[in-house]
Amino acid sequence: MRTRVKFCGFTREPDIQIAVALGVDALGFVLYEKSPRYVSAERVAQLCAHVPAFVNIVGLFVNSTVPQITRILSKPPISTIQLHGDESWNFALNVKKIMQRPVIKAVRVNPQTDWDEVAHYLDQLSGVLLDADSSVYGGSGDGFDWGHIPSELRGKIILSGGLSVDNVKNAIDTVAPYAVDVSSGIELSKGVKDAEKMRLFLERVRG
């Protein structure tokens, strides 16, 4: 099975057009106001006006309330919700039930990560994204030791955290994840994508 690819942190329409033309599976938009890659709900709608069918549009939320998520989802064409803050597993399940949309929950990996808990909820949500245990919520460029990931979970998870053109091939050979998610590793600057890095990243994923 091929590895799916999500590019995250878009702020500019030309970057989106390039990513779509290259064949990316999913586009991520950061709806967290404290992020340098933040875009408003209205801006997401504008940016996605010409995104074709079957490209998944993912909205990244950080510690938002259910009413806040509901309000934002009433505007742009977000098809998947990504919870990237300190949300509980039960909150993620509740959002999935209320919104009736796929929900991905991010887990910041550290030596205390409860892998039994991850395994328990992995099949109840639409995806679990593994990221570095950074002080910021995503897009830090920090990585983590893939050796922490139990072998029985590797083919089901979304791998993130410090991925780049230089290491994504090794990541796939080592982990064989369901999908990979990258933001800073394909950028010129925060929110500004590099067309050549996007091309090379996809090329190395798809081999």
Give the residues covered by each predicted segment.
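Conserved N-terminal beta1-alpha1 strand-loop-helix module at the mouth
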Residues: M1-G207
